[in-house]
Design a protein with these regions (language model features):
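Long, contiguous binding/interaction regions
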Residues: 1-20, 24-159
C-alpha cells in the first residue's frame, strides 16, 4: 500500500548548505517505513528522521480571504479574536486573516468559517522542530555533515 502526503514544506536552515524538508503523512508504520526508504535513496538526501508528534512543535500558516461587509464584519472580527488570527487586510467587501498554529487549530478555524464565503485560501504546510535541546540529527560536527554532501546530478562542487 502507498501513502499520501498531507503536507510538504521546504525551508532554509541555519546552515546555508542545507535545506530542511518537512513531510507530514497520516499512515501506518509500513507506509512510514516506505517513505523513509524512498527518501533515503535520493542522492541529495543527507539524513531522514522521524519527529515524535508529542515531543514536537508544529506550526502552519493560513492566509484566508473571506467576503466581509457591514453585516458580518463584527462576527468575523470576533472569530478572529477568539482564534488569535490577525486581520492583515480590509477592504469594503473582504477581509484577509492570518492564522498561525498547529494544523488542528487551522482545521478548526476553517470549520468555524465554513458558513462564510471563502474567496481565497492558502496554507503553507507544516514546519516542525523537536522540543528541548539540540536534536540528535543536529549533533554531528558540521564538517562531517558537509563531507557527506553530494552535488546534485548534473552539477559540480565549487573548488
Amino acid at each position: 500500500s502507498g501513502f499520501n502526503i498531507d503536507s510538504l514544506t521546504v525551508s532554509a536552515t541555519n546552515d546555508p548548505a542545507v535545506s530542511r524538508i518537512t513531510v507530514t503523512i497520516t499512515s501506518d508504520e509500513k507506509a512510514l517505513s516506505q517513505l523513509i526508504l524512498q527518501t533515503e535513496r535520493l542522492e541529495v538526501t543527507r539524513q531522514v528522521f522521524v519527529l515524535d508528534h508529542e515531543n514536537s512543535l508544529e506550526r502552519e500558516l493560513l492566509l484566508l480571504k473571506v467576503a466581509a461587509d457591514v453585516h458580518n464584519r463584527s462576527e468575523l472580527r470576533e472569530i478572529a479574536s477568539i482564534y488569535k488570527a490577525k486581520i492583515i487586510d480590509l477592504s469594503p467587501d473582504s477581509m484577509v486573516l492570518e492564522l498561525t498554529g498547529r494544523p488542528e487549530k487551522v482545521d478548526a478555524f476553517l470549520k468555524i468559517l465554513a458558513d462564510y464565503k471563502i474567496l481565497e485560501q492558502c496554507r503553507t504546510g507544516v514546519t516542525a522542530l523537536e522540543r528541548g535541546g539540540m536534536h540528535q540529527h543536529m549533533q554531528k560536527p558540521p564538517q562531517e555533515v558537509r563531507a557527506a554532501q553530494l552535488p546534485l546530478p548534473g552539477t559540480r562542487c565549487p573548488q
